[in-house]
């Protein structure tokens, strides 16, 4: 018996918009494929259905400020033209120093001293600094109770580290907590010399315990397809498709749901010049491969436009193509 070919899934991100249980949506892929435009557009569409939406840039280039033509910082800021869409930018390479100082406000000086002590301890554990930065941000974000959070991620290598950060942090914090008994007497003696009698190693330990609890919850949510999914963005070229397949495989290994792929920057008219014709044929070739590789995915096709997509109005207009498949205007150019 020969299996009948699967019916293509709807070429739209409507499935994500309708999935009210989603809490975390990651958008990523190779550099230069238009991830930021796509993630910003997705956030705009989600804002139509959800009470509050946050888009976070974890790319040091911080392109969402350029996309919305508005300056964002490490504190969630309302996007111009929206009542329920917020944006923030973090630099994962900055570690705990990137966090707002208000985060370390507490009943006493322990948390402020703890910032420096934690940073020094964390620096002794290779690979955990970036993960801890993500961990602190996730703790902040969870406390803000946004309906859904969209991550505009850095190129693939950084993205995979972001996805894996809960496991890295859980392992690293376990080591830190095991060091507590060794560090506590030294820390207590040090702060008493400075006259800060209300500072204790236990307060720092409690902070680590609290964070570990949050990260354990995040880890569970990341691997729950009802709460977390990943949207891959690519262009119809060899290297981008290769990177996308690698990303899909790595996400699957990590237990992260992925069933939507955006193919961006597609040509729809091509006979006006020889280069356009050549590019069109290349894209057709890789679109066929994408159809074969990802027959059980929603594949969304987005156009290469004549003008940049910038500003809230531009993003709003472009975001409609995530829901309703793009139809090029009729011209003599088309087949």
From Swiss-Prot:
Chain residues that bind Zn(2+): 273, 276
PANTHER family reported for this sequence: ARSENICAL PUMP-DRIVING ATPASE ARSENITE-TRANSLOCATING ATPASE, ATPASE GET3
Active site: 59
Ligand binding (ATP): 30-37, 237, 264
BP-aspect Gene Ontology terms: tail-anchored membrane protein insertion into ER membrane
Disulfide bonds: none
InterPro entries: Anion-transp_ATPase-like_dom (IPR025723), ATPase_ArsA/GET3 (IPR016300), ATPase_ArsA/GET3_euk (IPR027542), P-loop_NTPase (IPR027417)
Family: Belongs to the arsA ATPase family.
Name the UniProt record assigns to this protein: ATPase ASNA1 homolog
Record keywords, A-Z: ATP-binding, Cytoplasm, Endoplasmic reticulum, Hydrolase, Metal-binding, Nucleotide-binding, Transport, Zinc
Record-linked Pfam families: ArsA_ATPase
Gene3D superfamilies: P-loop containing nucleotide triphosphate hydrolases
EC class name: hydrolase
Keyword match tRNA-binding: no
An example molecular function term from Gene Ontology annotations: ATP binding
EC number from the UniProt entry: 3.6.-.-
Subcellular location field: Cytoplasm; Endoplasmic reticulum
Organism name: Drosophila willistoni (Fruit fly)
Subunit structure: Homodimer.
Role this protein plays: ATPase required for the post-translational delivery of tail-anchored (TA) proteins to the endoplasmic reticulum. Recognizes and selectively binds the transmembrane domain of TA proteins in the cytosol. This complex then targets to the endoplasmic reticulum by membrane-bound receptors, where the tail-anchored protein is released for insertion. This process is regulated by ATP binding and hydrolysis. ATP binding drives the homodimer towards the closed dimer state, facilitating recognition of newly synthesized TA membrane proteins. ATP hydrolysis is required for insertion.
């Amino acid at each position: 018996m020969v299996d009948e070919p699967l019916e293509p899934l709807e070429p739209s991100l409507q499935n994500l918009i309708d999935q009210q249980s989603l809490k975390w949506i990651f958008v990523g892929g190779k550099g230069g494929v238009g991830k930021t435009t796509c993630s910003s557009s997705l956030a705009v569409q989600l804002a139509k259905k959800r009470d509050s939406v946050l888009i976070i840039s974890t790319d040091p280039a911080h392109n969402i400020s350029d996309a919305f033509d508005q300056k964002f910082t490490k504190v969630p800021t309302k996007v111009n033209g929206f009542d329920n869409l917020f944006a923030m930018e973090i630099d994962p390479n900055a570690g705990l120093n990137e966090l707002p100082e208000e985060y370390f406000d507490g009943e006493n000086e322990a948390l402020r001293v703890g910032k420096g002590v934690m940073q020094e301890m964390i620096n002794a554990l290779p690979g955990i600094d970036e993960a801890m930065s993500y961990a602190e941000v996730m703790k902040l974000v969870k406390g803000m109770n946004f309906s859904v959070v969209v991550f505009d991620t850095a190129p693939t290598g950084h993205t995979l580290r972001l996805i894996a950060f809960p496991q890295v942090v859980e392992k690293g914090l376990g080591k830190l907590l095991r060091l507590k008994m060794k560090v506590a007497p030294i820390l207590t003696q040090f702060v008493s010399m400075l006259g800060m009698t209300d500072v204790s190693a236990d307060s720092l330990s409690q902070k680590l315990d609290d964070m570990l609890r949050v990260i354990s919850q995040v880890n569970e949510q990341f691997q729950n397809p009802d709460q977390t999914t990943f949207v891959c963005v690519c262009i119809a070229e060899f290297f981008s498709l290769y990177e996308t397949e690698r990303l899909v495989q790595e996400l699957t290994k990590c237990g992260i749901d992925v069933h939507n792929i955006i193919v961006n920057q597609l040509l729809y008219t091509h006979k006006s010049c020889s280069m356009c014709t050549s590019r069109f044929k290349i894209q057709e070739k890789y679109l066929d491969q994408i159809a074969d590789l990802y027959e059980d995915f929603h594949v969304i096709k987005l156009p290469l436009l004549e003008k940049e997509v910038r500003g809230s109005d531009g993003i709003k207009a472009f975001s409609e193509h995530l829901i309703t498949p793009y139809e090029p205007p009729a011209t003599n150019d088309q087949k």
